[in-house]
Amino acid sequence: MAEWLHWRASRRVFPKAEPAPDGGAEAVVVLGFPIKRNGGVHPLQRWRCRIAARSMDSRRDGVMVFTGGAIKRDQPEAEAMARYARDVLGVPKDRIRIETAAGSTWQNIEFSIPLIEHATRIAIASDPMHAARARRYLRLQRPDLAARLAPAADYRFLEAWWLKVPTATHELAAIARRNAGRVIRGLIPRAVSDR
């Protein structure tokens, strides 16, 4: 079930228009996740970095924007992931940008916008269900930038299968919370909700 949910999410929340032609600038936004207690890079962070690295188009000028603050640890998530991408995956330092203030997925997108506005092609690197939520947030915050969204290479059959169940559970809970909020807002009389 989790495998199917991630596969489906990897194909959702993209513009209907044709993708940007070859060439032009590219930005891959890599969403944060807390580092391990010992300061090491979490397996979910490593997965997101691998997704980002394989999503970069070698025919384009581009950057990877690592986003995430120091949420549960002293070190910002973005710095740990950027270091892993540079030192382990071989991402050139000049292609790395770091945003260290974000404390949520909404803020990951919001605070990355100044670093991706120049791009003609934008991809979001995370587990597929989380990336779909982030694409929806970009569409809400900046529809003009969401029109430049392109798929990341985020879904591979059975890749990181041990992470797909908990990430799918987390995203399904987020969807349930969002839907519950809509129901509750619908139950509040208009005069009360406008105050």
Task: Map each language-model feature to its residues.
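A structural signal for short, hydrophobic/glycine-enriched beta-strand patches
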Residues: 7-169
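C-terminal capping/extension of enzyme domains
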Residues: 158-195
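Transmembrane alpha-helices and immediately adjacent membrane-cytoplasm interface residues
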Residues: 1-3
